[in-house]
Swiss-Prot record:
Belongs to the aspartate/ornithine carbamoyltransferase superfamily. OTCase family. Its main location: cytoplasm. It comes from the Bacteria. Pfam families: OTCace, OTCace_N. This is Ornithine carbamoyltransferase. GO terms for biological process: arginine biosynthetic process via ornithine; citrulline biosynthetic process; L-arginine biosynthetic process. The keyword Amino-acid biosynthesis applies. The lineage of its organism: Bacteria, Bacillati, Bacillota, Bacilli, Bacillales. InterPro entries: Asp/Orn_carbamoyltranf_P-bd, Asp/Orn_carbamoylTrfase, Asp/Orn_carbamoylTrfase_sf, Asp_carbamoyltransf_Asp/Orn-bd, Orn/put_carbamltrans, OTCase_ArgI. Pathway: Amino-acid biosynthesis; L-arginine biosynthesis; L-arginine from L-ornithine and carbamoyl phosphate: step 1/3. The keyword Cell inner membrane does not apply.
């Protein structure tokens, strides 16, 4: 699709349904080619910068493996690896990197930062995550749902449970609206998305034959779901008062077997962008348990480890979908 050539991937709202479907189909094709050994490098001799203000396992590995598979060279700049925002403006960093690299990935805090990189670098820029959005994650989520459920995207009943304001919830709602899905956002009223984003997504959903429901009623929200999705309730670095308040608000929205059963769908699947606090077996998980007495947070270990959980297939699909984004915007077809 020539109209994706040289375009940045900052938010799904920049793309039409046809374009998102193209990226998902390309993801399937590239995944199949990798599995059977027929993959052709379409990013040969391309140089890609990975600019990370926030550390990551899946996003970094997905971009690096995808780039190497496609013949590209990668430079990783971690949280202390560049002067952007410290000794150099984002605008200046964009122009420096744009002169050396063919594409730039950014994972960090501000959506405005990734937009500035795209505006001034002169090369495709890909959003690996900001506080407001996470578009590459959603491509992996949707591809996984289609693979497992064997349904067209528009026929999937997709439900997000938890903090309705966070970047993953925002991105999922955008993607579901574009793809014409039936999307439910189940969250406390205090954690609803902004009216501006909600209204925009509802309008897009209506244009594509989809539907968006926001509710704090768990029974109503999860009924008939094909996918139950959640994310962490709080982020490290947020003050203790925020943790305490958020935990109290979200305790009833923990994804557990009872919630999965309430869907009434024996084939419902569970998705999560990871990492997940489903037990106290990590350093942070142990700290949460010691401070708040909570061993399992947004999802129980029972659900996380169940047959319904597709989180590791979903994690692998980060690489295939990210590869599709890079190939579509930078590759030589």
């Amino acid at each position: 699709m020539k109209n994706l050539r040289n375009r940045s991937f900052l938010t799904l709202l920049d793309f039409s349904r046809q374009e998102v479907e193209f990226l998902l189909t390309l993801s399937e094709d590239l995944k199949r080619a990798k599995y059977i050994g027929t993959e052709k490098p379409m990013l040969k001799n391309k140089n890609i910068a990975l600019l990370f203000e926030k550390d990551s396992t899946r996003t970094r590995c997905a971009f690096e493996v995808a780039a190497h598979d496609q013949g590209a060279n990668v430079t990783y700049l971690g949280p202390t690896g560049s002067q952007m925002g410290k000794k150099e403006t984002t605008k200046d960093t964009a122009r420096v990197l744009g002169g050396m690299y063919d594409g730039i990935e950014y994972r960090g805090f501000s959506q405005r930062t990734v937009e500035t990189l795209a505006e001034y670098s002169g090369v495709p820029v890909w959003n690996g995550l900001t506080d407001e959005d996470h578009p590459t994650q959603v491509l992996a989520d949707f591809l996984t749902a289609k693979e497992v459920l064997k349904k067209d995207y528009a026929d999937i009943n997709f439900t997000y449970v938890g903090d309705g304001r966070n970047n993953v919830a925002n991105a999922l709602m955008q993607g579901a609206a574009i793809m014409g899905m039936n999307f439910h956002l189940v969250c406390p009223k205090e954690l609803n998305p902004t009216d501006e984003l909600l209204n925009r997504c509802k309008n897009i959903a209506a244009e594509n034959g989809g539907n968006i429901l926001i509710t704090d009623n768990i029974d109503q929200g999860v009924k008939g779901s094909d996918v139950i999705y959640t994310d962490v309730w709080v982020s490290m670095g947020e003050p203790d008062e925020v943790w305490k308040e958020r935990l109290e608000l979200l305790k009833p929205y923990q994804v557990n077997k009872e919630m999965m059963d309430k869907t009434g769908n024996p084939n419902v699947i569970f998705e999560h962008c990871l990492p997940s606090f489903h037990n106290a077996d990590t350093k942070i998980g142990q700290q949460i348990f010691e401070k708040y007495g909570i061993r399992e947070m947004e999802v129980t270990d029972e659900v996380f480890e169940s047959k319904a959980s597709v989180v590791f297939q979903e994690a692998e699909n980060r690489m295939h979908t990210i590869k599709a984004v890079m190939v579509a915007t930078l590759g030589e077809f």
